[in-house]
């Protein structure tokens, strides 16, 4: 277990914020990779921490201090990223908190221009459960995490200043957190109500009974245009995709109705092939939307 006063910068002494509800290492949280304090970084970090005030103080363990806070995009498959287009930035937005013991991830959602709020999702991985943690890339830095259970995740769209800071801090933190590997050996989801570790694919907390949205219901929502996105709370994406899907569905139904009740055309292929093509596009669109939504469901979305 790493000491809360573990030195990160050779040029600065450890400094923990006094008299605060959160224990923050000011020498790390508010400085750049060279250890020089940046007022703009302090202001941005304070704003981020204030928006996590509902959950972060509850998550922190005794002798656990906040070292650094930064934003990133959560892991997502290239196909889903291509399918979502520019919506992917809101879909995968996440806040990561580096402490002396672990890396915390908080799922967030946008609230207007440059505003966001915590979206009831919290995950955690201890440094002992990481077989490797590297920052890769220059123009578009990524945080690549290799877990002891064999899984790998990439958090992308890091700011360069954050990437430099992580390159400095992560080796020291991993070197000083060499405890036993947990049963999961990787990132785990925590119940936002009681903070118990949640079991993958079990959508009820065994400790407090909190119920979460599940994959079975998500599949039923596929029957509604844009329903998969509405189910996971992505309403703006759901409205856009729902409109497109509704138009495609109406086109197929209109052709089918005309074929059944109207005059049949001499060349059936001229009707069947375009209709089948639209139906195929509709199905592919639904399947492509299902996978990123299923990923959110597997990160546990509480039922109110």
Model-derived segments and their meaning:
Residues 65-68, 93-106, 239-245:
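Conserved long hydrophobic alpha-helices within structured protein cores
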Residues 219-231:
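A short amphipathic helical element positioned immediately N-terminal to and/or at the very start
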Residues 75-142:
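Phosphoinositide-binding peripheral membrane targeting modules
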Residues 139, 143, 161-221, 240-304:
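Transmembrane helix recognition focused on a "late"/terminal membrane span
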Residues 230-241:
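Membrane-interface helix starts
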